Amino acid sequence: MAPVAGRSYVRRMKPGEHPDFYRFAPPPGTSRESTIRLDAEGKFWHDGERVDHPALEKALHEWIALHPDDGRYILTNGYDWTYFKVDDAPYIVRTLRVKADGVSLVLSDESEEPLAPETLRVGAGDALYVKVKGGKFTARFSRHAQTALAPILHEDKPGVLRLTVGGRDYPIG
């Protein structure tokens, strides 16, 4: 609706903008717990079945958040929310772009952000992990993204890795 001179308009608040949104009881006959699960490869499952609809899977990745009171993983679209299980990391680094001045990560929610090299660490099975979303979440590198790091990844001694970005070296913890 186009603004009309002399009239004021109030934007309607989405439920998710209410300060107590995450404290509201679930709809009658339902629970905030769900059978939705995110596996270590970044694939969503519901009731044991793979979520394979591309638009739904994209939305689920975009809805990942932390409950503000208990810190558990939730999915929220601003109108409702539910808890879900995360097998490993809530985000996956799908691809990366290596530039002379740094590396940018493309995450499973299709967002792009600069790599924070000081937050890199090696986990089980030699998987690489990094902090994302302002350090609030962890992302696991896909095999493709981890391989793309090879040109700037160096092994000084067996098992001791460092990353060279923008002329600086970062040890990987």
Language model features with spans:
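Terminal leader/tail segments of proteins
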Residues: P3-G173
